């Protein structure tokens, strides 16, 4: 066996600003050509380990290092970020934050210009990588104009063009719709083999990453590595939920049906999965589950009639949409990036005004209501928390809306503390917001709206950046207020797990119109809609098809059984 290209020996790291180590006694070897997934709950040390891999620690994030870490023969404490960047290319969670060129081709060539390469050499390299990454038609575009998947390919080109042999991805699926995420994983797998790369993926969406083969799954918890093995071995041991991670849907379905995972072969690859008598087992389980009648919501809350809007009136993003949301519904709004999901939300909340159409809330026209007046009834939580935060301290941020509305100090304290506990932020209530991770900031903005107790909530990608524990806590809380207060909640999401687990109605946007309005199980088993809306077949759909079950019935019964178990 060849020598490891990455090696940590008894390695620990403590930030200067912290009183305890963030990484504890890390022992890890990664070999050339391996594709490794690093997973773990928020605060487990994944991001810190990533910063060690690309040299940001200890150069940009000073602290105390014990033990040894070597990357491609270089000791991280003795190497510069520049030296390590020659071997390690990093693709960030938000590609926009690493673009430096005005056009795609300029961004691709940036590192070559720094290396003082000749124009013919730069032209040859950019043409080669543009072809490899399917960017030929985008070279003159601004990176900011591109879709999420295209932006990610540009970011990859910018680091691969310098012949980096180690590629580090920080949550590559966070901003992608399901279809783009599936394509991204396929591209990464292809590059691993064709370019002889060593790939490290930091991601908590394990099922989506496992759509392509992974050599090893490394799970972190409390700054330590608690599992390091083949994905199949870890899945068979049912360690996922114990370690704060979401297990694949098909694995949950097998367990619900009473399958002994010890009898399963190729458990990490649904296409190759082998289980004795699995078809009969699944059919028997499906027959034994009786679907309950869904709850009927018949009191209109938000009525939208013939709504049309376009930044260019000749090219409407929202085109003659008519839909009614009822009191007490929990709704998922889905569709390909750029289809108008956020635009529709901005129209509802008054940040944009429609070219035509009407909206009524609780029987009253929204046409003459200001943004503030609408905000008293409709809470809107943006995808990027940094666009909402207006104070420096967590408690003050959550309390701001109540203070502006003249709520008494004692009541402010009571309501803020209650919401902070539900959102998992109570212990941080006196912290500055700048000390929080992206996911923690997200929870602060959700808390700041929930504390106002509006009649309707719109949440844009509410679970982005959340680990399983905080995802479950947040969605359990939203479900509770939905059921107990009959609050209408609309979730703009790419998370198909969320659609199935927590919503009873899915509205699919595409081409300016509503493509489908139905139960999540109906949407996610409709092949035509999946393709049009850039969704992806869930593993439940694939499992049902492979064993001659009605996919819609199977998915609906799985969802019901999961909710009953929860």
Swiss-Prot record:
Record keyword Cell membrane present: yes
Places the protein is found: Cell membrane
EC number: 7.-.-.-
Domain ABC transporter positions: 6-247, 302-536
Gene3D superfamilies named in the record: P-loop containing nucleotide triphosphate hydrolases
Statement: the UniProt record of this protein carries the keyword Aminoacyl-tRNA synthetase: no
Family under the similarity heading: Belongs to the ABC transporter superfamily.
Known role: Probably part of an ABC transporter complex. Responsible for energy coupling to the transport system.
Name by which UniProt lists this protein: Putative ABC transporter ATP-binding protein lp_0149
Source species: Lactiplantibacillus plantarum (strain ATCC BAA-793 / NCIMB 8826 / WCFS1)
Lineage of producing organism: Bacteria, Bacillati, Bacillota, Bacilli, Lactobacillales
């Amino acid at each position: 066996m060849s020598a490891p290209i990455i090696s940590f020996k008894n390695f620990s790291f403590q930030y200067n600003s912290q009183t305890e180590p963030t990484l504890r006694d890390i022992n890890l070897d990664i070999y050339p050509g391996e594709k490794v997934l690093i997973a773990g709950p928020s605060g487990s040390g994944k991001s810190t380990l990533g910063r060690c891999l690309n040299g940001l620690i200890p150069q940009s994030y000073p602290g105390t290092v014990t033990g040894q870490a070597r990357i491609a023969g270089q000791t991280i404490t003795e190497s510069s970020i520049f030296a390590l960047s020659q071997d390690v290319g990093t693709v960030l969670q938000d590609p926009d934050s690493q673009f430096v060129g005005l056009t795609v081709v300029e961004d691709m060539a940036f590192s070559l210009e720094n290396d003082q390469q000749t124009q013919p050499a730069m032209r040859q390299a950019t043409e080669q990588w543009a072809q490899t990454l399917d960017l030929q038609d985008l070279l003159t575009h601004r990176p900011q104009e591109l879709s999420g998947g295209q932006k990610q390919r540009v970011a990859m080109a910018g680091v691969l063009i310098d012949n980096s042999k180690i590629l580090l991805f920080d949550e590559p699926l966070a901003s992608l719709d399901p279809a783009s995420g599936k394509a991204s994983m396929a591209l990464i797998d292809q590059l691993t083999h064709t370019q002889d790369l060593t790939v490290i993926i930091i991601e908590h969406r394990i099922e989506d990453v496992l759509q392509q083969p992974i050599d090893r799954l490394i799970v972190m918890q409390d700054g330590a590595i608690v599992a390091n093995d083949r994905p199949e071995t870890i899945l068979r041991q049912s360690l996922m939920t114990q370690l704060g991670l979401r297990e694949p849907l098909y694995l949950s379905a097998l367990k619900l049906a009473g399958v002994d995972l010890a009898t399963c072969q190729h458990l990490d690859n649904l296409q190759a999965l082998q289980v004795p008598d699995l078809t009969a087992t699944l059919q028997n389980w499906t027959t034994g589950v009786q679907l309950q009648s869904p709850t009927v919501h018949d009191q209109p809350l938000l009525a939208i009639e013939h709504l049309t809007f376009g930044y260019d009136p000749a090219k409407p993003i929202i085109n003659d949409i008519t839909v009614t949301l009822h009191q007490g519904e929990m709704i998922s709004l889905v569709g390909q990036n750029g289809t108008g999901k956020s635009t529709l939300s901005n129209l509802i909340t008054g940040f944009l005004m429609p070219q035509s159409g009407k909206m009524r809330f609780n029987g009253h026209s929204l046409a003459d209501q200001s943004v503030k007046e609408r905000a008293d009834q409709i809470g809107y939580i943006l995808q990027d928390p940094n666009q909402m935060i207006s104070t420096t301290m967590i408690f003050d941020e959550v309390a701001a809306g109540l203070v502006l509305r003249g709520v008494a100090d004692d009541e402010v304290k009571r309501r803020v503390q209650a919401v902070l506990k539900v959102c998992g932020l109570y212990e941080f209530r006196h912290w500055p917001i700048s000390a929080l991770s992206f996911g923690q900031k997200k929870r602060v903005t959700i808390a700041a709206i929930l504390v106002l107790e509006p009649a309707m909530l719109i949440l844009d990608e509410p679970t982005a950046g959340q680990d399983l524990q905080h995802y479950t806590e947040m969605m359990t809380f939203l479900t509770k207020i939905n059921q107990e207060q009959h609050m209408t909640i609309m979730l703009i999401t790419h998370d198909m797990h969320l659609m199935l687990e927590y919503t009873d109605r899915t509205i699919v946007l595409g081409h300016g119109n509503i493509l489908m309005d139905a139960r999540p199980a109906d949407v996610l088993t409709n092949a035509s809609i999946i393709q049009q809306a850039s969704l992806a077949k869930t593993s439940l759909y694939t499992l049902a098809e492979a064993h001659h079950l009605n996919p819609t019935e199977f998915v609906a019964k799985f969802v019901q059984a999961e909710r009953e178990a929860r």
